Structure formats: C-alpha cells, structure tokens
C-alpha cells in the first residue's frame, strides 16, 4: 500500500514487527498517466491512495483515467455525488497478470481530515488492519458490500423477502401503518437551573453509535406480520409495530427534566418496553407483530463494534491520533449507511425492510434512556441531548472527571469527550439555553464556539 503525492510515493511496511516508512521519488515520466502506472507497477504496489491536495488528484477525472496506455485496461468507479470524478480506478495489465488500484479519497465522501501523506497512509492502514479488507469505494458502496459479506452465512434472501407489501400495511381504518414514523432519538434541551448557572463549564460527550449497538441484540421480524386489533398480542419480545397512547405518569422523562417520548403514536416493540421501563403508562390500541424473529445483523454489527473497540483499547498500536479519528469516523459511516439500506426500497438498491429499521430505532431509544437514567442515578442531569451526544454543566474543567463514572473505566465503553476543552459557561452560552432557537442551531453554535477555542 502507498500514498501518492506530487513528488513521491510513500510506502508503509512492517520490519521486525514495527511499521516503517519508505519514500520513492517520482520520475519525470510520472507526469503522464501511462508513465505513472508503469512506475507504480515497478514498485510492486497493488493499491495506492492519492493525496487529495496533490495535483494528480485535482486533475483526475473519470474520462482522463479511461485514457490509460495500451498496456492497461481501466475500470473506473465514479463518485455517486459527482459522476465525472472518480472514487477509485482499477487497472488491469493487458494479460491480466497485474492489478493496480488508485483510490481517490477526495471524491469518495469519507469525512477524513488529511493534513499530510502520513495521515492518509495511517488511516488506510488502520482500516485495512481492523476490517481485513480494502475499502476504496464510496461510503454507500462500501457499506452495501460489507453488509452483504458479513451476512452471507445467514439465509439473507429468505429473511429479507416479506410476503406482504410493508409500505401499504393497513391499520384498522385502512390507512398505511407509518413504519418510518419511528424516530431514532430526541433533540432536546432545557433551561439551566439557578445552581447550574453558577457552574463554570459546559462539557459535551458523544457515544460512538447507539444504532450499531442496537443491531447487536435487536430482534427482527420474519414471515407474515399478524394484525392484533386490540394490541393484546404484545408480549415485549416479538418484533412489532404498535399504535399506543402514552402518559408520563410522573416519569422524569417528561421533556422538562429529561427528554421524553410522549408525542409518538406508532412505535416498535423495543420502544414500548422502554416506555414502560421509564415509568410511562402505555395503552396499546392496535398493532402488528411478526411471529418469527432473528438477529440477522448481529455478526455485522459486532464486527464493526469490535473494529473500533480494537483501535480505542490498543491505541499503542494505532498511535496516529488523526488517523485513528478518521478510521473511527469511517466505521461509523459504514454503520450509518448499512442501517439506512434497510429501509430503502428495493428499486433504490435497499432491502425494503422499514419494519427492521423501526425495531432498531426503538432499541436506540431504550439504550439512550438507560444511559440517561444511569447518569441521573450518579448525580448528573444533562441540559442538552442531540442524537448520540449530550451536554452537562460542571465546575470541573476536566472532561474525564466531570461526569462521575462515565470515562473512568480503563476500557473503551463507547463514550468520548465531545470537546477537547470545555466551553466556559459565559453569558453568551447561557443565553442559548434561555432563547427559543431550535436545538439543531444551538448545537451548531456550541460546536463552532468549541472549535474556536480548541488549541492548535
């Protein structure tokens, strides 16, 4: 594996159990595509990542790469967002004895920060190591490939096919059941209390991916969904989608003290169980359930979770901080796009299982509320929750000790500080919690302020 810059080919290897770098100066002939391919073949590399800031990356187009010399047959993969630009190009020698892949992260859609060639080489190396495969395509294509590969041992085609059209599944009155009405988590904030206003710092914490965590144990439906007109078939185990009436009944998950889940009418089995666990009164009015269930996504989700866990727990083997961040972000993207495939229609390349997506979303709610309940028992009340992130105020400037028990474990538990340096609880910050700005805008403002105050 190597990284191509304007002047050199940077190669990574292992000598005596240690990673070493080697540099090869590009010849003048490398200014032409045919000369570059010949040079790379002579170096014995089979995959090369092109540094986004290089002139070669900036002038590369799909049509230009198609004009390789007579010695090579190019297979160019275009970017889904910009079809004229390449995500990768596979070059086969005329006799097919040699294969060479050029990858263009500038156009693939990975959210990588790459200040230099070493950060790109380390990022690609870490991903190869934890995924045991090359990921040179776009996030969508790579996620589809990985999800397919890691579920091969299961009867995927049999489990994926629904005997009925899930998009038109009728309720008692003949209206389509809104399988995609289930949301994956709240965006919520509350005003600061007087005591909180006297604190000095605002900390942000993120969780890697509750959606991926949910996929490790969620039950997914198989077979023909069965109508339960009065909801009496609900048992808290079988996958289902249920029309409910929720009452907070004194629960602190009331959208005032903590985020709530009171405004949803159709929710999945894991979400119903979650609502009862946090003290809601739940009246099930009707619903559908699946008589058979399985955990098709468990092996895929566990593989991705263990990949990021390996990097976090063995940081001495993954020493490049930015590359480790890039690789972790890549694993999260693979999870996001893989889960999104479940509810995409088949004619759009998806699995057409919105019911599976609903079960995962409901399980996400359960995991979030369990985490929030644990924080409260330990004496911490979040002031803002958005997806997998939450914010707290504290007199402690250290993010590793500001929330008791959250980051004290020696092994990675999914949580990480969202801000390297906490925000000072200034009047400007406090005013954000007094105003009427949407939560999303408040989050963006806070993140921008934190970025401005992060040391270089």
What are these regions (language model features)?
Residues 2-456:
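Conserved acidic
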